[in-house]
Amino acid sequence: MRAVVQRVNSANVDVNGKIIGKIKKGLLVLLGVGKNDTESDAEYLVNKILNLRIFDDNKGKMNLSLLDIKGDILIVSQFTLYGDCRRGRRPSYSDSASPEKAKKLYEYFVEKIRKEYNIKVETGEFGAYMKVNLENDGPVTLLLDSKKVF
């Protein structure tokens, strides 16, 4: 499972001209599911993302997590995170999970956060064409992979 994690002052996701998810200060997470991913991959990334100390403390040092600041999280599915661009000019998505498997693990990821943590959780719409708007804070952008590829 892969994630692009961005620290934001605000973010929203629009489907067909309607904003369906909106957050203030927190994290925008673009989440991709790989064909070999399991619930343990989702659990690893939930724990990692929510506890990353990437928010400034009162001394300006990145020392606080999303949980510490009681920030919001916007989670958007993005299968293209598994695009392999090493050969040719068109990405191959053969390492992406099937839509059925990806949706199941995406929903598991989202529900784990909703049920176990007291933070605002917003989402995009799985499989839809979306417009994601954000105001980066920093910018701080991190790439995570549950298999620790990078």
Curated annotation (Swiss-Prot):
Gene3D superfamilies tied to this protein: D-tyrosyl-tRNA(Tyr) deacylase (3.50.80.10)
Listed Pfam families: Tyr_Deacylase
Catalysed reactions, semicolon-separated: glycyl-tRNA(Ala) + H2O = tRNA(Ala) + glycine + H(+); a D-aminoacyl-tRNA + H2O = a tRNA + a D-alpha-amino acid + H(+)
CC per GO annotation: cytoplasm
Keywords: Cytoplasm, Hydrolase, RNA-binding, tRNA-binding
The keyword tRNA-binding is assigned to this record: yes
GO molecular function, one term: D-tyrosyl-tRNA(Tyr) deacylase activity
Main enzyme class: hydrolase
Major localization listed first in the record, in broad terms: cytoplasm
UniProt subcellular location: Cytoplasm
Source organism superkingdom: Bacteria
Motif annotated as Gly-cisPro motif, important for rejection of L-amino acids, chain positions: 138-139
EC number: 3.1.1.96
Gene Ontology BP annotations: D-amino acid catabolic process
Subunit structure: Homodimer.
Function: An aminoacyl-tRNA editing enzyme that deacylates mischarged D-aminoacyl-tRNAs. Also deacylates mischarged glycyl-tRNA(Ala), protecting cells against glycine mischarging by AlaRS. Acts via tRNA-based rather than protein-based catalysis; rejects L-amino acids rather than detecting D-amino acids in the active site. By recycling D-aminoacyl-tRNA to D-amino acids and free tRNA molecules, this enzyme counteracts the toxicity associated with the formation of D-aminoacyl-tRNA entities in vivo and helps enforce protein L-homochirality.
Domain notes: A Gly-cisPro motif from one monomer fits into the active site of the other monomer to allow specific chiral rejection of L-amino acids.
Family from the record: Belongs to the DTD family.
Protein name: D-aminoacyl-tRNA deacylase
Species name: Thermosipho melanesiensis (strain DSM 12029 / CIP 104789 / BI429)
Gene name per UniProt: dtd
